[in-house]
Amino acid sequence: MTHPTIGILHPGAMGISVAASAQSSGCVVYWVSDGRSSDSHQRAQEHNLQDAGTLDNLCATCDIILSVCPPHAAEQVAGQVIGQGFSGLFVDANAIAPQRAQQIGRMITEAGAAFVDGGIIGGPAWKPGETWLYLSGERAREVAACFEGGMLETAVIGPDVGKASALKMCYAAYTKGTTALLSAILGTAERFNVRSELENEWSRGGSDFAGQTQMRVRRVTAKAWRFAGEMEEIAATFEAAGLPGGFHLAAHDIYQRMAQFKDAPNLPELAKILTALSNDGS
Protein backbone atom coordinates (compact mmCIF):
# COMPACT_ATOMS: atom_id res chain seq x y z
CA MET A 1 0.00 0.00 0.00
CA THR A 2 1.33 3.43 -0.96
CA HIS A 3 0.87 6.04 1.74
CA PRO A 4 0.35 9.71 0.90
CA THR A 5 2.98 12.27 1.80
CA ILE A 6 1.76 14.73 4.40
CA GLY A 7 2.71 18.30 5.20
CA ILE A 8 2.05 19.68 8.68
CA LEU A 9 1.50 23.40 9.24
CA HIS A 10 2.83 23.60 11.91
CA PRO A 11 4.54 21.25 14.42
CA GLY A 12 3.44 22.94 17.64
CA ALA A 13 2.54 20.93 20.73
CA MET A 14 -0.57 19.52 19.06
CA GLY A 15 0.71 19.48 15.49
CA ILE A 16 3.76 17.39 16.30
CA SER A 17 1.60 14.68 17.88
CA VAL A 18 -0.61 14.63 14.79
CA ALA A 19 2.52 14.31 12.64
CA ALA A 20 3.83 11.47 14.82
CA SER A 21 0.57 9.54 14.41
CA ALA A 22 0.79 9.87 10.64
CA GLN A 23 4.37 8.62 10.74
CA SER A 24 3.32 5.63 12.84
CA SER A 25 0.80 4.83 10.12
CA GLY A 26 3.48 4.74 7.42
CA CYS A 27 3.24 8.27 6.05
CA VAL A 28 6.24 10.49 5.41
CA VAL A 29 5.61 13.85 7.07
CA TYR A 30 7.14 17.16 6.00
CA TRP A 31 7.28 20.51 7.70
CA VAL A 32 8.45 24.04 6.81
CA SER A 33 11.45 25.27 8.79
CA ASP A 34 11.52 28.72 7.20
CA GLY A 35 10.54 31.32 9.78
CA ARG A 36 9.69 28.86 12.53
CA SER A 37 10.76 29.05 16.17
CA SER A 38 13.57 27.14 17.83
CA ASP A 39 10.94 25.08 19.69
CA SER A 40 9.41 24.00 16.38
CA HIS A 41 12.85 23.09 15.04
CA GLN A 42 13.53 20.99 18.13
CA ARG A 43 10.19 19.16 17.94
CA ALA A 44 10.61 18.43 14.23
CA GLN A 45 14.13 17.09 14.74
CA GLU A 46 13.15 14.93 17.71
CA HIS A 47 10.41 13.27 15.66
CA ASN A 48 12.37 13.03 12.41
CA LEU A 49 10.08 15.16 10.28
CA GLN A 50 11.35 15.82 6.78
CA ASP A 51 12.24 19.48 6.24
CA ALA A 52 10.73 20.92 3.06
CA GLY A 53 12.47 24.18 3.86
CA THR A 54 9.89 26.47 2.30
CA LEU A 55 6.15 26.43 1.80
CA ASP A 56 6.44 26.21 -1.98
CA ASN A 57 8.53 23.04 -1.65
CA LEU A 58 6.04 21.58 0.82
CA CYS A 59 3.13 22.23 -1.53
CA ALA A 60 5.00 20.70 -4.45
CA THR A 61 5.96 17.61 -2.44
CA CYS A 62 2.91 16.66 -0.39
CA ASP A 63 -0.36 14.97 -1.29
CA ILE A 64 -2.12 16.17 1.85
CA ILE A 65 -1.52 19.31 3.92
CA LEU A 66 -2.87 19.61 7.45
CA SER A 67 -3.32 23.00 9.06
CA VAL A 68 -2.99 22.92 12.85
CA CYS A 69 -2.50 26.53 13.96
CA PRO A 70 -4.05 29.15 16.26
CA PRO A 71 -7.62 30.00 15.19
CA HIS A 72 -6.84 33.53 14.07
CA ALA A 73 -4.34 32.26 11.47
CA ALA A 74 -6.57 29.68 9.74
CA GLU A 75 -7.42 31.77 6.66
CA GLN A 76 -3.88 33.07 6.40
CA VAL A 77 -2.42 29.56 6.29
CA ALA A 78 -5.02 28.40 3.77
CA GLY A 79 -4.38 31.46 1.61
CA GLN A 80 -0.64 30.88 1.65
CA VAL A 81 -1.13 27.29 0.51
CA ILE A 82 -3.48 28.40 -2.27
CA GLY A 83 -0.91 30.97 -3.31
CA GLN A 84 1.57 28.18 -4.01
CA GLY A 85 -0.81 26.48 -6.44
CA PHE A 86 -1.41 23.44 -4.23
CA SER A 87 -3.80 21.00 -5.92
CA GLY A 88 -3.88 18.18 -3.36
CA LEU A 89 -6.05 17.68 -0.27
CA PHE A 90 -6.10 20.41 2.39
CA VAL A 91 -7.31 19.60 5.91
CA ASP A 92 -8.19 22.43 8.29
CA ALA A 93 -8.03 20.95 11.80
CA ASN A 94 -8.19 24.25 13.64
CA ALA A 95 -10.56 25.35 16.41
CA ILE A 96 -12.79 27.54 14.25
CA ALA A 97 -16.50 28.13 13.82
CA PRO A 98 -18.21 25.91 11.22
CA GLN A 99 -19.07 28.87 9.02
CA ARG A 100 -15.37 29.76 8.85
CA ALA A 101 -14.51 26.17 7.96
CA GLN A 102 -17.04 26.36 5.14
CA GLN A 103 -15.57 29.65 3.93
CA ILE A 104 -12.05 28.20 3.92
CA GLY A 105 -13.39 25.13 2.14
CA ARG A 106 -14.76 27.34 -0.63
CA MET A 107 -11.42 29.15 -0.89
CA ILE A 108 -9.59 25.86 -1.28
CA THR A 109 -11.94 24.20 -3.76
CA GLU A 110 -12.25 27.31 -5.93
CA ALA A 111 -8.46 27.27 -6.19
CA GLY A 112 -8.54 23.71 -7.52
CA ALA A 113 -7.68 21.68 -4.39
CA ALA A 114 -9.84 19.39 -2.24
CA PHE A 115 -10.92 20.17 1.32
CA VAL A 116 -11.73 18.24 4.50
CA ASP A 117 -12.93 19.82 7.74
CA GLY A 118 -11.35 18.61 10.97
CA GLY A 119 -11.84 19.14 14.68
CA ILE A 120 -9.45 17.86 17.35
CA ILE A 121 -10.85 16.99 20.78
CA GLY A 122 -8.36 16.27 23.56
CA GLY A 123 -4.76 17.16 24.25
CA PRO A 124 -1.69 16.20 22.22
CA ALA A 125 -2.09 12.63 20.99
CA TRP A 126 0.54 10.64 22.87
CA LYS A 127 -1.76 8.01 24.41
CA PRO A 128 -4.35 5.82 22.68
CA GLY A 129 -8.01 6.64 23.14
CA GLU A 130 -7.49 10.15 24.52
CA THR A 131 -7.40 12.40 21.45
CA TRP A 132 -9.86 12.33 18.56
CA LEU A 133 -9.72 13.93 15.14
CA TYR A 134 -13.25 14.27 13.83
CA LEU A 135 -13.48 14.66 10.06
CA SER A 136 -16.20 15.75 7.65
CA GLY A 137 -16.04 16.15 3.90
CA GLU A 138 -16.23 14.07 0.75
CA ARG A 139 -12.66 12.77 1.15
CA ALA A 140 -12.62 12.47 4.93
CA ARG A 141 -11.96 8.72 4.88
CA GLU A 142 -8.72 9.28 2.97
CA VAL A 143 -7.52 11.50 5.79
CA ALA A 144 -8.63 9.08 8.50
CA ALA A 145 -6.62 6.30 6.85
CA CYS A 146 -3.43 8.32 7.37
CA PHE A 147 -3.71 7.87 11.15
CA GLU A 148 -4.96 4.31 11.50
CA GLY A 149 -1.67 3.08 13.02
CA GLY A 150 -1.00 5.96 15.41
CA MET A 151 -2.18 7.24 18.78
CA LEU A 152 -4.57 9.78 17.23
CA GLU A 153 -8.07 8.34 16.98
CA THR A 154 -10.24 9.39 14.04
CA ALA A 155 -13.95 9.46 13.30
CA VAL A 156 -15.60 10.40 10.01
CA ILE A 157 -18.93 12.05 10.79
CA GLY A 158 -20.28 12.82 7.33
CA PRO A 159 -19.67 14.54 4.00
CA ASP A 160 -20.73 18.04 5.07
CA VAL A 161 -17.95 20.57 5.62
CA GLY A 162 -18.47 22.38 8.93
CA LYS A 163 -19.82 19.42 10.86
CA ALA A 164 -16.46 18.48 12.42
CA SER A 165 -15.81 22.09 13.41
CA ALA A 166 -19.29 22.41 14.91
CA LEU A 167 -18.69 19.37 17.10
CA LYS A 168 -15.35 20.76 18.25
CA MET A 169 -16.96 24.10 19.12
CA CYS A 170 -19.80 22.51 21.10
CA TYR A 171 -17.39 20.31 23.04
CA ALA A 172 -14.94 23.11 23.86
CA ALA A 173 -17.82 25.41 24.80
CA TYR A 174 -18.22 23.29 27.92
CA THR A 175 -14.69 22.13 28.72
CA LYS A 176 -12.86 25.41 28.17
CA GLY A 177 -15.85 27.62 28.81
CA THR A 178 -16.38 26.26 32.31
CA THR A 179 -12.70 26.73 33.16
CA ALA A 180 -13.07 30.40 32.27
CA LEU A 181 -16.25 30.58 34.36
CA LEU A 182 -14.54 29.02 37.38
CA SER A 183 -11.65 31.45 36.98
CA ALA A 184 -14.08 34.37 37.03
CA ILE A 185 -15.87 32.95 40.07
CA LEU A 186 -12.63 32.67 42.03
CA GLY A 187 -11.59 36.16 40.96
CA THR A 188 -14.89 37.62 42.10
CA ALA A 189 -14.85 35.74 45.40
CA GLU A 190 -11.30 36.94 46.04
CA ARG A 191 -12.26 40.54 45.34
CA PHE A 192 -15.14 40.37 47.84
CA ASN A 193 -13.02 38.47 50.39
CA VAL A 194 -15.23 35.39 50.42
CA ARG A 195 -13.03 32.90 48.55
CA SER A 196 -12.18 30.94 51.71
CA GLU A 197 -15.86 30.57 52.57
CA LEU A 198 -16.71 29.60 48.99
CA GLU A 199 -14.03 26.94 48.91
CA ASN A 200 -15.19 25.63 52.28
CA GLU A 201 -18.68 25.30 50.82
CA TRP A 202 -17.27 23.49 47.79
CA SER A 203 -15.43 21.11 50.14
CA ARG A 204 -18.43 19.93 52.14
CA GLY A 205 -18.77 16.17 52.24
CA GLY A 206 -15.09 15.64 51.55
CA SER A 207 -15.19 16.93 47.98
CA ASP A 208 -11.88 18.04 46.45
CA PHE A 209 -13.64 20.36 44.01
CA ALA A 210 -11.97 23.44 45.50
CA GLY A 211 -8.47 22.02 45.08
CA GLN A 212 -9.25 20.69 41.62
CA THR A 213 -10.61 24.07 40.57
CA GLN A 214 -7.51 25.90 41.78
CA MET A 215 -5.26 23.56 39.81
CA ARG A 216 -7.49 23.75 36.76
CA VAL A 217 -7.23 27.55 36.76
CA ARG A 218 -3.47 27.50 37.27
CA ARG A 219 -2.87 24.98 34.50
CA VAL A 220 -4.93 26.77 31.89
CA THR A 221 -2.76 29.89 32.04
CA ALA A 222 -0.14 28.45 29.67
CA LYS A 223 -2.74 28.07 26.92
CA ALA A 224 -5.01 31.01 27.77
CA TRP A 225 -3.55 33.14 24.95
CA ARG A 226 -4.72 30.51 22.46
CA PHE A 227 -8.04 29.76 24.13
CA ALA A 228 -9.04 33.43 23.95
CA GLY A 229 -9.43 33.22 20.19
CA GLU A 230 -11.23 29.90 20.47
CA MET A 231 -13.85 31.49 22.73
CA GLU A 232 -14.63 34.03 20.00
CA GLU A 233 -15.10 31.16 17.56
CA ILE A 234 -17.49 29.43 19.95
CA ALA A 235 -19.45 32.66 20.40
CA ALA A 236 -19.75 32.98 16.61
CA THR A 237 -20.93 29.36 16.44
CA PHE A 238 -23.63 29.97 19.04
CA GLU A 239 -24.79 33.10 17.23
CA ALA A 240 -24.94 31.25 13.91
CA ALA A 241 -27.26 28.76 15.64
CA GLY A 242 -29.53 31.59 16.83
CA LEU A 243 -28.23 31.51 20.41
CA PRO A 244 -26.49 34.29 22.37
CA GLY A 245 -22.71 34.30 22.19
CA GLY A 246 -22.19 36.39 25.30
CA PHE A 247 -21.13 33.48 27.50
CA HIS A 248 -18.01 32.87 25.48
CA LEU A 249 -17.27 36.49 24.62
CA ALA A 250 -16.88 36.94 28.38
CA ALA A 251 -14.72 33.80 28.47
CA HIS A 252 -12.57 35.41 25.78
CA ASP A 253 -11.98 38.38 28.08
CA ILE A 254 -11.06 36.09 30.98
CA TYR A 255 -8.49 34.19 28.93
CA GLN A 256 -7.15 37.42 27.47
CA ARG A 257 -6.42 38.64 31.00
CA MET A 258 -4.46 35.42 31.63
CA ALA A 259 -2.42 35.70 28.43
CA GLN A 260 0.50 37.32 30.27
CA PHE A 261 1.36 33.92 31.79
CA LYS A 262 1.98 32.26 28.40
CA ASP A 263 5.74 31.81 28.79
CA ALA A 264 5.90 31.41 32.57
CA PRO A 265 8.56 28.81 33.48
CA ASN A 266 6.41 27.43 36.31
CA LEU A 267 2.72 27.31 37.13
CA PRO A 268 1.80 30.77 38.42
CA GLU A 269 0.46 31.06 41.93
CA LEU A 270 -3.30 31.38 42.14
CA ALA A 271 -3.06 34.76 43.87
CA LYS A 272 -1.18 36.23 40.90
CA ILE A 273 -3.77 34.90 38.48
CA LEU A 274 -6.68 36.34 40.45
CA THR A 275 -4.93 39.70 40.65
CA ALA A 276 -4.46 39.69 36.87
CA LEU A 277 -8.13 38.85 36.38
CA SER A 278 -9.36 41.70 38.54
CA ASN A 279 -6.90 44.18 37.01
CA ASP A 280 -7.87 43.59 33.36
CA GLY A 281 -4.76 41.45 32.88
CA SER A 282 -2.37 44.33 33.55
Please state what every model-predicted region is:
Residues 266-282:
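Short, basic/aromatic-enriched C-terminal tail that caps enzymatic domains
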Residues 1-60, 84:
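NAD(P)+-binding Rossmann beta1-loop-alpha1 motif at the extreme N-terminus of oxidoreductases
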Residues 55-115:
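Rossmann-fold NAD(P) dinucleotide-binding segment
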Residues 167-269:
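Helical "substrate-binding/catalytic lid" subdomain
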Residues 6, 96-176:
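Rossmann-fold dinucleotide-binding core
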Residues 29, 51, 114-116, 154, ...:
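Hydrophobic beta-strand scaffold residues
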